[in-house]
Amino acid sequence: MKANPPLAWHPVPVSAPVNLRWWLMHQESLTRLLQAHCEHFRVEPVFQTLATACIDELEVMNLRRQNQVLVREVYLRCNETPVVFAHSIVKKEHLRGAWRGLSRLGNRSLGTMLFTNPLIQRTPLAFKKLKPHHPLFERACKQLQMRPINLWARRSLFILLRQPILVTEVFLPAIHQL
């Protein structure tokens, strides 16, 4: 049996802890789900710039290594505790098209926009256990007091007018307290 390459994302989070699987597999808006589970919810923007995509994002976004994308990263906080690190990328040229408002979201939820527009289509979720060498693991851990051994993430494409945005959500240890 052939081993999965280290960059692979999987259609099912088979080895994820049972109490995390429910969060990972939830198909609707993660923003709305978190809002229902905490008294105070907020989006904290931490990074937004034009950059190159992570190596495991290139194929799914049909990018070359040198292509510029808008990278937006935020923490989703429940009662001031970061519970999810969200990372989204969109091709630079699509910022003048379907995703033109993305660069001005600020502390507003991208999820709210994605799940209220009936023209946006979502691809199936993919899952990965992120290890410390993965760039998203490193960035997700910046505000954590203790670094975990690994972090589970999920991602999917949202497509508007044939223009995709890739949204990756990294679940932080505090999610278990909700």
UniProtKB/Swiss-Prot annotation:
Enzyme class name:
lyase
Q: Which pathway is it part of?
A: Cofactor biosynthesis; ubiquinone biosynthesis
Q: Does the keyword Transit peptide apply?
A: no
Stretches of the chain forming a coiled coil according to its record: none
Keyword Cytoplasm found? yes
Q: Which GO terms describe its cellular component?
A: cytosol
Q: Which reaction is the catalytic activity of this chain?
A: chorismate = 4-hydroxybenzoate + pyruvate
Question: Record-annotated residues binding substrate?
Answer: 72, 110, 169
Q: Which InterPro entries does the record cross-reference, listed alphabetically?
A: Chorismate--pyruvate_lyase, Chorismate_lyase_/UTRA_dom_sf
Q: Name one GO molecular function term.
A: chorismate lyase activity
Q: What is its main location?
A: cytoplasm
Q: Which family does it belong to?
A: Belongs to the UbiC family.
Q: Give the matching PANTHER family.
A: CHORISMATE PYRUVATE-LYASE (PTHR38683:SF1)
Name listed for the protein in its UniProt record: Probable chorismate pyruvate-lyase
* Species name: Nitrosomonas eutropha (strain DSM 101675 / C91 / Nm57)
